[in-house]
């Protein structure tokens, strides 16, 4: 089956499939990639996608959806410079792992250590510290200078006293990112000045009502549904899987956080860095007043659908931020 431009029956702008559709073996599209060719679940119905370039003048326009390539992803990575010290390369602080999931501490710390970072500072529970040091001997334990945080990976919901203490520690950290409800600009300035923060797994239910955009949340469909339900939305995991873009946008709207919705196609929703910038990414285009940026990545191998992959992702994000 060959689809012309897009498969029949899919939501062109949002990738949703709400009725009968015809899955394609090959989709031939024209001018630029349409959002549904990049967004699930419609993206799974496209087969092999071929773009016929009509040389449209798209420079200077903000794409509604951008597909990550190796080249434009590499442009965001800061390479070490000759005079860099460990502090100039960055210090990532991690509060991860638990008695039940000690491996999450190791995976998140090792991932951060291998992602171009100057120092790992680990502040998880005692049960995890020895195995973290065994796996990452350069890790530093305890409080100190931190330039980006990772919290929540492998942290269960209060199963032991150590878990309770760890959740209290994370909750105290998160209070510094809470935007005020009384429009006090001084309080908000403090939150915006905090370092980047990755909130994963067991810390998602501790997220304040509203946070600045340097807070990155990394839920899968079930975790995003729980976060939205706690904020009054009527949604479950299957709803998120059926309309992932809609619910990722809704989570960003409600919380202010940058939302990284994990899946076979990962969707990232956040504030655009510069709405006037040029982009070499190919994608569907929106008007110039768009206030969100949507980036998708679907190039990962299926073997990443395994326990621990989210812990590795969180550690890498903390190092990159």
Task: Tell what function each PLM region has.
Residues 24-26, 35-216, 221, 225-321:
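Small-residue (G/A/S/T)-rich helix-start motifs and N-terminal tracts that mark the onset
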